[in-house]
């Protein structure tokens, strides 16, 4: 796990987003995920490549930065249990990650996401894939990044010589533009891309702990970053699909029962990921019933 400050990661949400992405990738073309222009033939990927932060990352031994599942004995880690959203998508096609293999054959999912990553790190992650062989037109790529940027900007607002609110919002917008620029560059390299906007940081356990004013600013910063992603990515559903993670988090927080959630404000993990497992949850917490895994 990165020593850098990190935002709370979604618990139940990671699978809900995965379901949304699965619907996108199984439907008749990426156009069903959002974005104009229809596609006649369904897109069937030969590889999955994931970019982003801890929401999409693994440790070398397959641990996730969320609630980690255990085998039937209740003690042995099982990286396939409680899959993060990128695993849900990979599972549709029978793909596995090197960090969490499926079978003994070639693992056709590649995780480039890194814990603690910011918008500026996305270009580095993409370049790592370019150096390893690049992209092909049957590659499905996922991008979800920006939550750590929002926390960084919020921490700037608390400094003695804090930038103005307008300056912070503009900085968030620029992070969104930077992310969108890399998404469009991925398309130029031949990949099909699904972009997930980041959850509303103001609704996370850490965000709520900042008080009403702090949470409101975090929500505004989140909206500024996500908004620039949405208006700057290529608006062509043949190449780019969009999943609204921010709207999901807002709906889940407002009406948790709609997603079979019993808690949408507290962190499920009693210890910080990636050490968190289904055996180390807070009192009353469940991996599927609580929206947020972590609050650090």
How would you label these PLM feature ranges?
Residues 1-13:
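N-terminal secretory signal peptides that target proteins for export/translocation
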